[in-house]
Design a protein with these regions (language model features):
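Extracytoplasmic small-molecule ligand-binding "clamshell" domains
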Residues: 20-88, 250
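Periplasmic-binding protein-like
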Residues: 30, 107-114, 191-228, 248-255
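Ligand-binding cleft/hinge of the Venus flytrap
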Residues: 38, 52-60, 139-158, 164, ...
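Extended ligand-binding regions for polar small-molecule ligands
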Residues: 50-58, 120, 129-130, 135-138, ...
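Short helices/loops that flank or line small-molecule/ion binding pockets
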Residues: 57-58, 66-67, 71-84, 98-100, ...
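A conserved helix-loop-strand patch within extracytoplasmic ligand-binding domains
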Residues: 61, 89-90, 95, 102-151
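Ligand-binding clefts/hinges and TM-proximal coupling segments of bilobed small-molecule sensing domains
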Residues: 62, 139-155, 193-197, 228-255
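A ligand-binding cleft/hinge motif common to bilobed small-molecule-binding domains
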Residues: 72-75, 87-97, 142-146, 173-208
Length: 255
């Protein structure tokens, strides 16, 4: 009996050691600058990527990034194509029906962006205008619930950078996007100078949830606990601030 218990203990220890050292496959959508995008030589980078690497370091795993179009993120996770999603995915009630989430690692608002010559006094004032959004995003959910119902034409895209290409081409009047993503990307680049934020910052929980977290399959309780603890650790040890300050001028962790 003692030999059996000893063997079981050794097996458990080996399994734990193996889990700690193995790769963690992380899904990203590399079209969402400055959160996830590619360098000139094709390597993934951005706030989400750096956060993922910091979390992997804390839990003694190695991040292996898997590129996935946004609307296939959760189906790919459920199909076990990767272990987690670390790609600015908001924690919403709808998503929690399918997957689990760690604690949040940032929380920033979204906002409507329109051409400067368009007068905005509320959704009704842009009836007939055409707004582009990322398919399966919280911004799409908001646009369908609050803008389309007021007569705004909502067009969904597979990637956010496709939205900006069509805005520049004159096929769209604007977008709804994360304030940091669009502010640090499209609005600050050539082609974005004729567009601006309108209306209030959008934090509506039924659309935008409670911040971005790491998505996992249900039943991965131990990994979920480890990642949430790792988020707290990098907040405490200064790694989070170093990453944050590389991309942003204020703490995006939020309230």
């Amino acid at each position: 009996m003692k030999k059996f218990l000893l063997a079981a203990a050794i097996t458990a220890m080996c399994a734990t050691a193996f889990a700690a050292g193995k790769d963690l496959k992380v899904a990203i959508d590399a079209t969402y600058e400055p959160f996830t995008f590619k360098t000139a030589d094709g390597k993934p980078t951005g706030f989400d990527v750096d956060i993922a690497n910091a979390l992997c370091e804390e839990i003694k795993r190695t991040c292996v990034f898997v590129e996935q179009p946004w609307d296939g993120m959760i189906p790919g996770l459920l199909a076990k194509k990767y272990d987690v999603i670390i790609s600015s995915m908001s924690i919403t009630e709808d998503r929690l029906k399918q997957v689990d989430f760690s604690d949040k690692y940032y929380n920033t608002p979204s906002r409507i962006v329109l051409r400067k010559d368009i007068k905005f006094s509320g959704p009704e004032s842009i009836k007939g205008k055409k707004i582009g959004v990322l398919k399966a995003s919280t911004q799409e959910k908001y646009a369908l619930g609050e803008l389309k119902t007021k007569g705004v034409e909502v067009v969904s895209y597979d990637a956010q950078d496709q939205v900006y290409l069509d805005i520049k081409a004159g096929r769209l009047d604007g977008t709804v996007a994360d304030i940091l993503e669009v502010g640090g990307g499209f609005l600050g680049k050539p082609g974005g100078e004729n567009y601006q934020f309108v209306g209030q910052e959008l934090f509506i929980p039924k659309y935008f949830g409670g911040g971005a977290g790491v998505a996992l399959r249900k039943g991965q309780g131990e990994l979920k606990t480890q990642i949430s603890a790792a988020i707290k650790a990098i907040r405490a040890n200064g790694k989070y601030k170093t990453i944050n300050d590389k991309y942003f001028k204020f703490d995006v962790y939020g309230k």
